């Protein structure tokens, strides 16, 4: 009887797992089942104001499941940090009519559960002398977050830092040019990010032109099953990856390291100073250094005390060999549906192996790279019922352009609402 009961419990778990829908086509890793705002209201950003009706902040700060779409392009000059404190939100940057959205002056902070953020730019800069991350977040109890195709740069602290979150994916993000000798209270601080969490996947991201923290693995309780795979690191200064203390458990697999003009060494990892971190390191490529590529362990400090022979549990992704990951990342990473001139130049310099900005590619101010690009603005398609789906698209798929409620219906697919089908389809046509 006990065995029969156990069988049906197991069957229920399997059925539930099979029934779960991934966040969107291409979502991978531990955060792939994040639902975001699925089934909730559609909120349309209609202006570039910092606050008020139609602003991005107004949409973010509302409660309940919600999907945020954009009827405008351009740069939003924030007047204070923009905090996602309320659960269940999808931010669909790919919905903007042309070049998309950039957040300026203050950070975007993800402190909620069940969050999907896609295809936006976060470029803080030094205008307000703000000692902060660009895109940050992570708190104990936070679950289910996926950050996808985000471009973040010009932070005075780290460009992208998120940890403490359970079931997290950061994928296809372009993290570039933190500000090194700027106004940070600790002095020079051109750092990429602090990455970690419990069941956290970081894959196919680009870390470019940071002096250190490429990345730093978080050294807080609960840093377990962190999978760092198929990422590209270019032109680090004095450190690539380090950290992972407080008994961290980290996989570093199949990443591609390309030294640039500022790179001072070919090390892959400096282990945590407290000696408690454990790391599985395998299959990483150091361009131009066959010794490190053949034997990753020779590029790890204190290798005999911290390396393990088998990987920690991880959620499989569509994994590439490192050289293929490098090519794909340069082609697809960041806010790639419509790249701005700055991202294009970063990727060109990575490909060429150069660093013409600042000192050997390490910068102290966004002024050294030309500042915020002007984003092209487009005209949104007519949307009579303001449900986020243009009339022409609703007509094509047999929906009612005078009924806003059909955005959250499952007319076209049993797993995704109609607005999700529209948003996911936009990327196929770019």
Q: What positions do the PLM features span?
A:
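Acidic Gly/Asp/Thr-rich repetitive segments characteristic of extracellular carbohydrate-active
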Residues: 23-68
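Structural detector of coil-to-beta-strand junctions
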Residues: 107, 134-136, 159, 181-182, ...
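Extracellular beta-strand-rich, repetitive "passenger/adhesive" scaffolds
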Residues: 94-102, 120, 402-406
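Right-handed parallel beta-helix
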Residues: 88, 93, 113-124, 141-154, ...
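Proline-centered structural pivot motif
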Residues: 376-381, 392-430
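Extracellular beta-strand-rich solenoid/capping regions of secreted or surface-exposed proteins
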Residues: 57-64, 76-90, 101-118, 124-142, ...
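Bacterial Sec-dependent N-terminal signal peptides
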Residues: 1-20
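Extracellular beta-rich repeat passengers
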Residues: 219-366
